[in-house]
Curated annotation (Swiss-Prot):
This is Tropomyosin. GO terms for biological process: regulation of muscle contraction. Residues 102-131 have a biased composition (Basic and acidic residues). It comes from Mimachlamys nobilis. Disulfide bonds: none annotated. PANTHER family: TROPOMYOSIN. It comes from the Eukaryota.
Amino acid sequence: MDAIKKKMQAMKVDRENAQDLAEQMEQKLKDTETAKAKLEEEFNELQKKLTATENNYDTVNEQLQEANTKLENSEKQITQLESDVGGLQRRLTLLEEDYERSEEKLNSTTEKLEEASKAADESERNRKVLEGRSNSYEERIDELEKQLETAKNVATDADHKFDEAARKLAITEVDLERAETRLEAADAKVLELEEELTVVGANIKTLQVQNDQASQREDSYEETIRDLTKSLKDAENRATEAERQVVKLQKEVDRLEDELLAEKERYKAISDDLDQTFAEIAGY
């Protein structure tokens, strides 16, 4: 009878120990599942950050390419404007030279006109005095009159050319003003592009990458890409490590579940043994 009591006592202790162990295993399983859920959440967060980093990388790359394209277009426009201004300046110089030549020609024509007028007056006096002389003298008068008419026509043409030169000069001044306006607009566009590049740099800083000089030089852009690539690789490494941790924890959970199942079976066996012992005692 004492042996049975001792056996019952030992079985009771084993059952209590098994129950305590089962509770501990259940708690450990819960803790492990909590850690697993946390790691899975961190893994998902890393996946989101990885996706965001890739998207940010593509966005930054596109923004930098677009900024470089705009800057190149602005430089081409400025070069074209400078070429246009140079052409207008050359045209203005030619017009000024043409104007000077026209003015000289006008002065010369005016002098000739005065001389022709004087000659005509002199011829008129001579004609009155020498009237009746040979027809050759009259022809000379006609010739002088023709020369006078020619001189007047030359003076008129010179006036027209002077007016035309003045008109071209005015047009050139208007074109020059327009070119200056276009140049100012190009300068404003360059400033606008520089502001856009500054905004791009600020956006890149908010993405926690070192790309604050991406708008200035290509080597800074390449350095930023290297930083983004490194961050991407770090994120991939962290994601890989998280996957390994999840697999490891899953194995630990499976092992604990197996141990818990074994302890439950052991507990059931002890309970069955106790029930059988109680039944035997009751039979006595």
